């Protein structure tokens, strides 16, 4: 049991990170409708809140967080990422959030140090 707890303390736990990202999105965007003039502010708030909460976990990681907000207008979006890392310690998580007027896609990467 101690081995599991020790690895849990230094592991990238996707559910934990996903919840942090969702809370940051809800806090920054909440029930707002898409407004082009606010997108820069919203994306900045989402990534900064996410990074702040991730660092508060006190885990030995360097974090990378990206955020894309796009208006719902029928346009498509295709993205991809690739990482060369140690899959036993490093990890990533992508959260797609939406409301009636926009999509918000956040990716968080944790690199063990």
Curated annotation (Swiss-Prot):
Q: Which InterPro entries does the record associate with it? A: Tctex-1-like (IPR005334), Tctex-1-like_sf (IPR038586)
Where in the cell is the protein located? Golgi apparatus; Cytoplasm; Cytoplasm, Cytoskeleton, Spindle
SS bond list: none
Region spans: Interaction with GNB1? 41-113
Q: Which residues carry this modification: N-acetylmethionine?
A: 1
Output the PTM entry: Phosphorylated by BMPR2. The phosphorylation status is proposed to regulate the association with the cytoplasmic dynein complex and may have role in cytoplasmic dynein cargo release.
Keyword list, A-Z: Acetylation, Cell cycle, Cell division, Cytoplasm, Cytoskeleton, Dynein, Golgi apparatus, Microtubule, Mitosis, Motor protein, Neurogenesis, Phosphoprotein, Transport
MF term (GO), any: G-protein beta-subunit binding
Task: Tell me a GO biological process for this protein.
Answer: neuron projection morphogenesis
Any single GO CC term annotated in Swiss-Prot or TrEMBL for this entry: cytoplasm
The keyword Aminoacyl-tRNA synthetase belongs to this UniProt entry's keyword annotation:
no
Family of this protein: Belongs to the dynein light chain Tctex-type family.
User: What is annotated about its quaternary structure and interactions?
Assistant: Homodimer. The cytoplasmic dynein 1 complex consists of two catalytic heavy chains (HCs) and a number of non-catalytic subunits presented by intermediate chains (ICs), light intermediate chains (LICs) and light chains (LCs); the composition seems to vary in respect to the IC, LIC and LC composition. The heavy chain homodimer serves as a scaffold for the probable homodimeric assembly of the respective non-catalytic subunits. The ICs and LICs bind directly to the HC dimer and dynein LCs assemble on the IC dimer. DYNLT1 and DYNLT3 compete for association with dynein IC (DYNC1I1 or DYNC1I2).
Role this protein plays: Acts as one of several non-catalytic accessory components of the cytoplasmic dynein 1 complex that are thought to be involved in linking dynein to cargos and to adapter proteins that regulate dynein function. Cytoplasmic dynein 1 acts as a motor for the intracellular retrograde motility of vesicles and organelles along microtubules. Binds to transport cargos and is involved in apical cargo transport such as rhodopsin-bearing vesicles in polarized epithelia. Is involved in intracellular targeting of D-type retrovirus gag polyproteins to the cytoplasmic assembly site.
Which protein, by its recorded name, is this? Dynein light chain Tctex-type 1
**Organism, scientific name:** Rattus norvegicus (Rat)
Gene assigned in the entry: Dynlt1
């Amino acid at each position: 049991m101690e081995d599991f707890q020790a690895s849990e303390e230094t592991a990238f736990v996707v559910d934990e990170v996903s919840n942090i990202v969702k809370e940051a999105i809800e806090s920054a965007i909440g029930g707002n409708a898409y407004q082009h003039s606010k997108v820069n502010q919203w994306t900045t708030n989402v990534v900064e809140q996410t990074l702040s909460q991730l660092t508060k976990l006190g885990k030995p990681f360097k974090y990378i967080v990206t955020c894309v907000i796009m208006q719902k207008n029928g346009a498509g979006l295709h993205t991809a990422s690739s990482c060369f890392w140690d899959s036993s310690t490093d990890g990533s998580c992508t959260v797609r959030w939406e409301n009636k007027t926009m999509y918000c896609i956040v990716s968080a990467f944790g690199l063990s140090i």
